[in-house]
Regions:
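Catalytic-domain carbohydrate-binding cleft regions of carbohydrate-active enzymes
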Residues: 1-157
Length: 158
């Protein structure tokens, strides 16, 4: 999920005179309350989740700074011995403990997800799955498909 709360707002004066080389391509409302009450509740929940994930994110950003290991990783980054992970183009690891499998088509409510070796907890149902297999997952508009590696404390933020 994109969690953007910043950016250009509607202009109050022409910036061209002050900054002739700057092109402002946006200017629309982008605050979470700008998209209606139903969407506000969804976006507010995502912002709150991001805040709960802050220590996890900071840890992996520090690690990225020290080692160059990205926080958002292709599946084969951590599971290089699993050949299936080299074929996955639409799911990724977020650090070592969170697996995201986005729904990317409008109207889609489910998808197949490959879980690599280990035990994985569905963040929506808290059901535990054994890895090295495909599972079918569903999610509503206000949810996303994600799994946490069993044993990780990050499950507590979901």
């Amino acid at each position: 999920p994109v969690m953007r709360l910043h950016g250009s707002r509607l202009r109050t004066k022409n910036q061209k005179d002050r900054h002739p080389d700057v092109k402002e391509r946006s200017g629309g409302d982008n605050e979470i309350w700008s998209f209606g009450e139903e969407n506000y509740k969804i976006l507010k929940g995502l912002v709150e989740l991001r805040e709960r994930l802050r220590p996890y994110i900071c840890h992996y950003m520090d690690l990225a700074s020290e080692t160059g290991a990205p926080i958002m990783r292709p599946m084969f980054f951590d599971y290089y011995e699993d050949e299936v992970c080299y074929t996955l183009e639409d799911q990724y690891m977020f650090g070592e403990d969170i697996l995201f499998a986005p729904i990317s088509a409008q109207g889609q409510t489910g998808r197949e997800v490959y879980l690599p070796e280990g035990s994985w907890i569905d963040v929506n149902t808290k059901e535990v799955y054994e890895g090295k297999k495909w599972v079918t997952c569903t999610a509503q508009l206000h949810q996303f498909i994600a799994f946490v590696r069993e044993g990780s404390n990050v499950i507590n933020v979901f």
